[in-house]
């Protein structure tokens, strides 16, 4: 494994976490405004689900060291 691979994986994990956090927060806001009378718990729930999904994806990326974005990488 080269030195740049973990850096790329961390960058991908952080970008994925920001996207999923923002999406979860946005969906929580929509549900909060439309169904739950402006309560705060849908925001926290949506954000938590997004972060949990991002954590799971990052964990999977770091557990499979020879798989990089769907391509098998041969060790030299």
Swiss-Prot record:
Its main location: mitochondrion. GO terms for cellular component: MICOS complex; mitochondrion. The chain crosses the membrane at residues 17-36. The modification N-acetylserine is found at residue 2. One of its GO terms (biological process) is cristae formation. Residues 37-76 are mitochondrial intermembrane. Keywords: Acetylation, Membrane, Mitochondrion, Mitochondrion inner membrane, Transmembrane, Transmembrane helix. Pfam families: DUF543. It is a single-pass membrane protein. It is found in: Mitochondrion inner membrane. InterPro entries: Mic10 (IPR007512). It comes from the Eukaryota. Belongs to the MICOS complex subunit Mic10 family. Component of the mitochondrial contact site and cristae organizing system (MICOS) complex, composed of at least MICOS10/MIC10, CHCHD3/MIC19, CHCHD6/MIC25, APOOL/MIC27, IMMT/MIC60, APOO/MIC23/MIC26 and MICOS13/MIC13. This complex was also known under the names MINOS or MitOS complex. The MICOS complex associates with mitochondrial outer membrane proteins SAMM50, MTX1 and MTX2 (together described as components of the mitochondrial outer membrane sorting assembly machinery (SAM) complex) and DNAJC11, mitochondrial inner membrane protein TMEM11 and with HSPA9. Component of the MICOS complex, a large protein complex of the mitochondrial inner membrane that plays crucial roles in the maintenance of crista junctions, inner membrane architecture, and formation of contact sites to the outer membrane. This is MICOS complex subunit Mic10. It comes from Rattus norvegicus (Rat). The lineage of its organism: Eukaryota, Metazoa, Chordata, Craniata, Vertebrata. The gene is Micos10.
């Amino acid at each position: 494994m080269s030195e740049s691979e973990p850096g790329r994986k961390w960058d991908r994990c952080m970008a994925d976490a920001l996207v999923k956090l923002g999406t979860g927060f946005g969906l929580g806001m929509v549900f909060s405004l439309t169904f739950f009378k402006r309560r705060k718990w849908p925001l926290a729930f949506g954000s938590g689900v997004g972060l949990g999904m991002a954590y799971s994806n990052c964990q999977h990326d770091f557990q499979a060291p020879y798989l990089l974005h769907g391509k098998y990488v041969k060790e030299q």
